[in-house]
Amino acid sequence: MDCVFCGIIAGEIPCAKVFESESVLAFKDIAPQAPVHIVFIPKNHDITSMDGITGANSAVVAEIFAAIAQVAREQGLDAGYRVVCNCGEHGGQTVGHLHFHLLGGRKLGVGMV
């Protein structure tokens, strides 16, 4: 297993699930950067990064963003939250499987880097 997220999807690696649908999985990050830090991934490994999104495969991205909004409401993030997607080595991406981070639960700094 080369992809840790595929291992989580397959049930080979445990996770604290927060949301699951037919094509999206969300779970608590194992090294949280905020009180609420949830990772959202497509269950299919077809898209490895933001630059792999096309019109043909963008439906799963729309589903991920709908799931992020739903989970943010469920987590009580009414005061605000941040969604992050690292793209490529220089963007800080460490897992070659498209994923988005939902961060919240406290006031986040205004800096992006």
Q: Model-found features: residue ranges?
A:
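HIT superfamily nucleotide-processing domains
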Residues: 1-113
